[in-house]
Amino acid sequence: MNAGILGVGKYVPEKILTNFDLEKMMETSDEWIRTRTGIEERRIARDDEYTHDLAYEAAKVAIENAGLTPDDIDLFIVATVTQEATFPSVANIIQDRLGAKNAAGMDVEAACAGFTFGVVTAAQFIKTGAYKNIVVVGADKLSKITNWDDRATAVLFGDGAGAVVMGPVSDDHGLLSFDLGSDGSGGKYLNLDENKKIYMNGREVFRFAVRQMGEASLRVLESAGLEKEDLDLLIPHQANIRIMEASRERLNLPEEKLMKTVHKYGNTSSSSIALALVDAVEEGRIKDNDNVLLVGFGGGLTWGALIIRWGK
């Protein structure tokens, strides 16, 4: 028995903030943002819309798409860095709202790599037989910690949530390999400043991302016994089109094997990879027996990569 994905779901706020909107708010331009990041627009949550609201909506859809009910869920794992409070956890809030009375809940925090950490954690519970059905959510409301006076970072971030239901699948499907890591010495390059707003040393983060995403991708390929050409789809953290293209080139993959949502969502941190995965499923980009590589990096500094063979 292995652990695989049984259903997916997402939620993004209604409000769209375009690059042209940002031109009216700060000294920037659509051309400058697009050429450097690939971002054209991002979603922004309402003031009264919180991370747990985003997570709840995505989880609800994922459970429905898996053909399950909240009573079938054993555990909720929510990857996020924008909890409204230290406790209760976002996972506990959505467990209550969904009426999933049989489930436990916990949050994991690995920034933009958080969803990969959540998926790998869920897989261990399933493979041991401890739990059967686990909901993993990546959700963040980055707009509340964005420094809107810093044009270098304000143009990057958006809000949203993506979710998957994980459960038992056959041995030759599901999670084939993973590589999680951290380099705490780089924590100073990406963190919250004294005003609890995002600070980023873009140059250092770029170097770290390109290096670690590339190396982690090669390691999970080797662990899974696969070659680069065996990959059917690459879903990287949607931070910046240049980093994403560097990941694709490191693997010698054609353009059509790179999943891109950065243009319409921006960088949504913990939900970035999850949202891209859900969009790939909804667009028919993933079919049974496809080998899908998820890879990301984040504040910490952290990285996570994994390969899933789609299907049961």
UniProtKB/Swiss-Prot annotation:
The active site is at C112, H237, N267. Residues 238-242 are annotated as: ACP-binding. One of its GO terms (molecular function) is beta-ketoacyl-acyl-carrier-protein synthase III activity. The keyword Lipid metabolism applies. SUPFAM superfamilies: Thiolase-like. Pathway: Lipid metabolism; fatty acid biosynthesis. The keyword Transferase applies. GO terms for cellular component: cytoplasm. It comes from the Bacteria. It is an enzyme of class 2 (transferase). GO terms for biological process: fatty acid biosynthetic process. Keywords: Acyltransferase, Cytoplasm, Fatty acid biosynthesis, Fatty acid metabolism, Lipid biosynthesis, Lipid metabolism, Multifunctional enzyme, Transferase. It catalyses: malonyl-[ACP] + acetyl-CoA + H(+) = 3-oxobutanoyl-[ACP] + CO2 + CoA. InterPro entries: ACP_syn_III_C, ACP_syn_III_N, FabH, Thiolase-like. Its EC number is 2.3.1.180. It is found in: Cytoplasm. The last Arg residue of the ACP-binding site is essential for the weak association between ACP/AcpP and FabH. Catalyzes the condensation reaction of fatty acid synthesis by the addition to an acyl acceptor of two carbons from malonyl-ACP. Catalyzes the first condensation reaction which initiates fatty acid synthesis and may therefore play a role in governing the total rate of fatty acid production. Possesses both acetoacetyl-ACP synthase and acetyl transacylase activities. Its substrate specificity determines the biosynthesis of branched-chain and/or straight-chain of fatty acids. HAMAP family: FabH. Homodimer. Belongs to the thiolase-like superfamily. FabH family. This is Beta-ketoacyl-[acyl-carrier-protein] synthase III.
